[in-house]
Structures are given as structure tokens and as C-alpha cells.
């Protein structure tokens, strides 16, 4: 009998996906419309337009921008359109939402852009913990993307994986 240690995980053919690798690698700046409101609550069209015209958008140049309003008030749809028209000349991308929601949206786009054919009939483990927090919606997205492509889909680590899906033969 030999005392050779065999790495069964390395020989198993498992592919580990770390969702953190699909996190967007960009800075997202926020533009809160509250600063353009009268008393932080009311949008006056004339004042709003003048404020936008006088606003220095240089900080948003070539950045991804999240546009939202933190005030608990009603903002007409055209106001977001007007802000987008001003930002379009400066920013690289404009999204509705706060920084976190835009980051999640971009994260989701990266997962949806994943080439699922790379994992055709493979055993895949989606890593359960990593360097950055990953929302539940991203785990749902990767499951939708890979199910029916992979031979098996698991969650966790190779040493303690939870089976999620196994293709019927």
C-alpha cells in the first residue's frame, strides 16, 4: 500500500466560478437630483433647467453615472430625461438608480454576457463566498444561464458543495 496523497478535487474535472470575477471594474458616480430641488422637495421647471445649465458636469466626465433622487417627492419623468441629455456629453454611461443598484445592474450584465457554451456538459461549482458581497439575484442569474448546459451545477466549495442541478441522462 502506498502513502501517496491523491488530490481527488483536482482530478474531478470540476470548474469553479467565482462570481466576484464578473464584478464591474469601474467607478460609478452618483448624481442626486435632490440638490436641484426647491427646498429639497419641489421641482420648479425653470429653476431646475437653470441649475442644470449652470452645473459643472466635469466630475462625471468619462465616468459611469447613477442618476436618482433621494428626496421623498414626485419627480416628473422628463426631469430624468433632461438630466440624461446634459450628462450624455460628459459621461461614458448613464443609468437610473443609486450607486449600489447600478453596480448590481452592471454586475448582472456581465453574468448575462457569460458564454455558457464554455461550460457545456461540465461539472460546475459556483463559489459561495469571496472577496466582495454577491447578491442573491446574481446567483439566480448564473443558475438560469447555466442550467440545461452543464452536467451538474453546485454551490459552495469542492470540499462541501451543495448540489443544485444535475442533467438527466
Language model feature labels by segment:
Residues 79-118, 158-161:
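Long, charge-dense
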Residues 99, 123-127, 155-163:
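Short, surface-exposed recognition loops or helix-turn segments adjacent to catalytic cores
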Residues 1-74, 91, 150-152, 156-157, ...:
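N-terminal, charge-rich interaction modules
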Residues 64-70, 95-97, 123-129:
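Short glycine-rich or small-residue beta-strand-to-loop segments that form or flank ligand, phosphate
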Residues 70-77, 129-137, 160-161:
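Gly/Ser/Thr-rich loops at beta-strand to alpha-helix junctions
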Residues 82-88, 138-147:
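Short, non-transmembrane amphipathic alpha-helical segments
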Residues 116-141:
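Extended, charge-rich low-complexity interaction segments
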Residues 53, 112-116, 147:
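Signal for well-folded cores of large energy- and translation-related assemblies
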Amino acid at each position: 500500500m502506498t502513502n501517496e496523497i491523491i488530490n481527488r478535487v483536482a482530478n474531478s474535472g470540476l470548474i469553479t466560478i467565482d462570481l466576484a470575477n464578473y464584478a464591474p471594474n469601474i467607478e460609478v458616480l452618483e448624481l442626486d437630483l435632490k440638490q436641484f430641488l426647491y427646498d429639497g422637495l419641489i421641482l420648479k421647471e425653470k429653476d431646475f433647467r437653470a441649475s442644470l445649465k449652470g452645473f459643472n458636469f466635469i466630475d462625471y466626465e468619462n465616468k459611469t453615472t447613477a442618476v436618482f433622487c433621494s428626496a421623498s417627492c414626485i419627480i416628473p419623468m422628463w426631469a430624468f430625461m433632461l438630466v440624461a441629455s446634459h450628462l450624455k456629453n460628459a459621461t461614458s454611461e448613464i443609468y437610473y438608480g443609486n450607486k449600489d443598484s447600478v453596480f448590481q445592474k452592471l454586475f448582472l450584465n456581465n453574468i448575462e454576457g457569460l458564454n455558457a457554451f464554455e461550460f457545456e456538459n461540465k461539472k460546475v461549482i459556483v463559489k459561495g463566498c469571496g472577496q466582495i458581497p454577491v447578491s442573491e439575484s446574481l446567483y439566480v442569474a448564473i443558475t438560469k444561464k447555466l442550467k440545461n448546459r452543464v452536467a451538474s451545477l453546485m454551490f459552495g466549495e469542492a470540499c462541501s458543495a451543495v448540489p443544485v442541478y444535475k442533467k438527466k441522462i
